[in-house]
Amino acid sequence: PICAETCPRNPAMEQVLHRFTSQVDEKYSHIVGRFRRELTHPQRTQETELGNLFADIFTRSLGVDVMLIGSGSIRAEKLGPIVTYGDLIEGFPYDDGVFMFKVTGQQLRQMLRYMLREEAYTGHTEFYQLPSTLRLRYDRRKGDFDYFTYCGREVGKEIGDDALFTVGLQNYHFKNIESFFNISYDTLCKIQKPRSVATSCQDILMEYFREHEMLDAAVDGRMTILPSTAQTG
């Protein structure tokens, strides 16, 4: 049996373990960011506060027109107002890189229309959080957009078929782009060969958190789905 007689204490080993666990605790309890308030991500098949914040951070940090964040990669239902390293890697655990590619306005519209098909609302496909540069309203009954606008260059301008956009996508999602967006790698290469623009999503977030305090985000209607997923999901 394991007891004090058969397994006497080893003070030297206890000291080593204590030092190790203290270092681990210090690393994971280190504060990496501060929000103005707690931000939420209650459901992955709808626009969320955390999803909006992350999509905007990556879009700005990487200098792309549109960053599409896999909604399922945000595992936390809430985060903040104090964000520790442990909170971040638990809430956004997949430390993937990012690929950038170019698409036309017509292709971007087709990609997001495919993303918003009916299977998305039952959890059978991936869903994406959008940056504030995009604003759209999708009508599930007709399977198309009421409007699909880009606000980065001209506010409220309807996206033309021939317009070109740089899009960022996490590596895992890029490798599965045909399954998730119904567009092939070969099709993307006809405009420009996709390339890696970042190796660590977590590093991008932490760097942005260091440079910007008291961050906030709101569900601002950038992605409106009718009827809403709350009514039907």
Language model feature labels by segment:
Residues 1-61, 65-233:
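Catalytic centers of hydrolytic enzymes
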